[in-house]
A protein has these predicted regions:
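Central helical "cap/lid" subdomain
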Residues: 45-84, 111-114, 130-133
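C-terminal catalytic lobe of FAD-dependent flavoproteins
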Residues: 20, 134-192
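Hydrophobic/aromatic beta-strand patches that form the interior of the parallel beta-sheet core
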Residues: 32, 48, 163-165
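Short, hydrophobic alpha-helical segments
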Residues: 25, 29, 129, 183-191
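Flavin (FAD/FMN) cofactor-binding and adjacent substrate-gating region
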Residues: 1-28
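Generic recognition of long tandem-repeat/solenoid scaffolds
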Residues: 3-7, 100, 163-165
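Active-site lid/adjacent beta-loop-alpha segment flanking the redox-cofactor pocket in flavoenzymes
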Residues: 79-159
Length: 192
């Protein structure tokens, strides 16, 4: 079945972005690295819970239809410089490597990279030929998804100072800027 070519797309270096964001907050005395304890906050303070997949452990919101999923990717050595996708994807970095992926596993979310995941990725990325010696490293992460694949944002039904901003899954980097503005407008400007 062929593959599609991805043109004029951008890729966010999420690690670099998160590190720069953290440094900005540290520099502006707005970063705390303590374990969050709800008891330390008054009932008047507004709190936005953005916990990723760990929201499933939050007694305020764990009844909601969250469906975290572990995903795996591989970094391979390659000289192919064209991004491609056929449901799986291939993203070159321009310096002789590429990321390929990915998998979905709703059962073993904390297991890390697996041989089964590696084999699945290689099989699904059949639009490029991958030799074992090309594989440099396997990665895994947990998507904070929901059963219907839509984020869950809004106010708690009985505690109007607690808000939830979660469940973005694999589309978080592209949708969070839009939804964060909507959330701030809702909290600060009372816009729905």
């Amino acid at each position: 079945f062929g593959a599609g070519l991805t043109k004029r797309a951008y890729q966010l270096n999420v690690s670099a972005f998160l590190n720069a964001s953290k440094q900005y907050l540290v520099n502006n005395d707005s970063w705390e690295s303590n374990k969050f304890d709800l008891e330390e906050y008054s009932d008047e303070q507004k709190i936005i819970f953005c916990e990723g997949f760990r929201v499933i452990d939050n007694p305020l919101f764990n009844h909601l239809p969250f469906a975290p999923a572990r995903g795996e990717t591989l970094q391979i050595k390659t000289m192919v410089k064209t991004p491609m996708s056929n449901g799986s994807w291939y993203l070159p970095d321009g310096v002789g490597c590429a990321l390929i992926g990915s998998t979905w596993d709703h059962e073993n979310i904390l297991s890390g990279p697996t041989k089964e995941g590696k084999n699945e990725i290689i099989e699904k990325c059949n639009f490029i030929k991958i030799q074992e010696e090309q594989i440099e490293e396997g990665f895994s992460g947990v998507r904070s998804g929901t059963r219907d694949r839509n984020p869950i944002i809004g106010v708690h039904p009985t505690k109007n100072n607690y808000f939830l901003f979660n469940g973005f899954g694999s589309r978080g980097t592209s949708t969070i800027p839009y939804y964060s503005k909507k959330m701030i407008d809702f909290i600060i400007h009372k816009k729905e």
